[in-house]
């Protein structure tokens, strides 16, 4: 079975050092991979926007998708963290009712999570590096969303925030070439 994190050794670190694709590709969006002090969690529930959290539609707002990231930042941003290299649970993947939204999650919700981490104190250079990496599939996923329409989350996209603001990152543009390279590589293998 493939591990969620590529980490091979346990590591003590600071909270924001967890936000790295070399630690966890989803930047803590996979809630099931986290263990934390419940008391700190409960003491910081006030940061949630309950009105936006109740918005209908799977992954429709940052708050109904990533509410726990707001809590994590409020509760743990000044805390030490521990990365356990050996998996403590088995989490299987298979059918996901939101699988058609994966491109949307990767190029909209993950960058939004990084923006939020930055607003809560993440180092600028770490933010820029990580955000650039997160946009490695930007154009091909954006076109998939445009073609797929509402069922792929097009109705949740804010063109200015989710498209234009990401064009300053090199990987947004390189994503075109990455996509072509992967396609050519697949054809050569066949």
PLM segments and residue spans:
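Conserved nucleotide-sugar donor-binding catalytic segment
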Residues: 10-101
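C-terminal subregions of glycosyltransferases and related glycan-biosynthesis enzymes
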Residues: 70-73, 77-190
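Conserved donor NDP-sugar-binding/catalytic core segment of glycosyltransferases
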Residues: 1-9
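Intrinsic-disorder/low-complexity, polar/charged segments
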Residues: 8-15, 123, 169
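Alpha-helical interaction segments
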Residues: 5-6, 31, 114
């Amino acid at each position: 079975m493939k591990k969620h994190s590529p980490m091979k050794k346990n590591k003590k670190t600071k909270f924001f050092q967890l936000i790295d694709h070399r630690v966890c590709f989803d930047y803590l969006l996979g809630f099931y991979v986290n263990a934390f002090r419940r008391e700190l969690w409960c003491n910081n529930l006030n940061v949630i926007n309950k009105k936006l959290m109740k918005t209908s539609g799977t992954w429709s707002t940052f708050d109904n998708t990533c509410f726990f990231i707001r809590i994590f930042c409020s509760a743990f941003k000044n805390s030490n963290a521990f990365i356990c290299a050996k998996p403590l649970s088995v989490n299987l993947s298979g059918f996901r009712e939101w699988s058609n939204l994966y491109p949307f999650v990767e190029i909209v919700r993950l960058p939004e999570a990084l923006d939020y981490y930055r607003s809560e104190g993440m180092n600028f250079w770490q933010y820029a590096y990580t955000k650039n990496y997160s946009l490695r599939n930007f154009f091909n996923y954006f076109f998939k969303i445009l073609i797929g329409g509402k069922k792929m989350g097009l109705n949740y996209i804010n063109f200015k925030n989710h498209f234009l603001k990401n064009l300053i990152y090199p990987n947004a543009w390189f994503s075109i070439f990455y996509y072509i390279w992967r396609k050519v590589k697949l054809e050569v293998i066949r």
